[in-house]
């Protein structure tokens, strides 16, 4: 494996693209007993439309998450979680809008656990009976999600902000769409995207990098298989629908999310530059040390629940903030006004440099987390960027770029405000 050194971070990364197309990345952590492995595919809930073997396939919403659930089934009734537990390893998985990850964590029997991780993720086994059974389980999960105010306020926000992009559809799908899923559909999605050339295996821990690559090659073979081609039919305008959705739920006080549409996510070095600019813009506009945050807090418009940041998903990006408040509309007006002030007057250069150093320090400290390191290496790999190069991006970003971003993005026509009110107050107040 090729060795890459990052003296500024004190990090080393071993990386290799196997003959079968799989990328293997290993971050050594000498002396640590914990070992973590992520096996990730560049495929998430928004990738429902794709081509395979010359056919256009339009899969039901929620199929990526459904497939994640079913990958833990192996022929012969084998229980993957029980087998890993017997080896002393824990396992889990998650589906996001644009990727699906399976991971194991252990302090012993790492090689056996790694083999089992690769085996179950690479073995499609779907029966009519098991698929029908899973529908009931996921339908319950959908019901729980629909009863969660934090989920509903976000889903209502993106449904108002986005007209075409599939972030407007819940990752879990709906009770109706999951009932359209068949074993053959799951096999098609697995064959299209669970191929070595569309995946990355990332390991953090006190392990032999070459041995990790050898195991992956042994388990997956040398044949490079074709990858499904994602269809991205999103022609997304930059303006929002102009609607501010509200609903009533069992909450103690109104909760809100405010979002501003940004230009679609980038790739390569532009991807992390876009994220850094967006994060710094959020910090300058309404971060805890910002002028606006202190003003809103002193006026009682926000409390410790308030926060925000910059989010990207394949094909979209947005600046957002959220919290509990009885007057979210006033908060929106204050944010629009403060953004205009920053654009007009600029940022204090000393304050900007302190903010940039603080943000860089947080990202460096984040590398202490095995999970965060694995996740970010995988996510940025799919954006064609070497994540450990992020310090240079912070050094390059200038305060004028933050002004330009805020002037372009924080506009009335690009925003939507989603509010969940307490049931008893829905008929009494308009927010």
Model-derived segments and spans:
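His/Glu-rich zincin catalytic helix
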Residues: 1-79, 187-295, 415-431
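Histidine-acidic residue clusters that define the catalytic metal-binding segment
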Residues: 2-15, 160-199, 233-234, 363, ...
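M16 family metallopeptidases and their MPP-like homologs
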Residues: 27, 32-50, 79-120, 154-176, ...
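Short, polar/flexible loop-turn hinges at active-site or ligand-entry regions and domain interfaces
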Residues: 122-129
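Mid-domain, small-residue-enriched loop/turn segments at the edges of structured enzyme/sensor domains
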Residues: 149-153
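Short, low-order "capping/linker" segments at domain edges
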Residues: 143-147, 241-253, 360-371
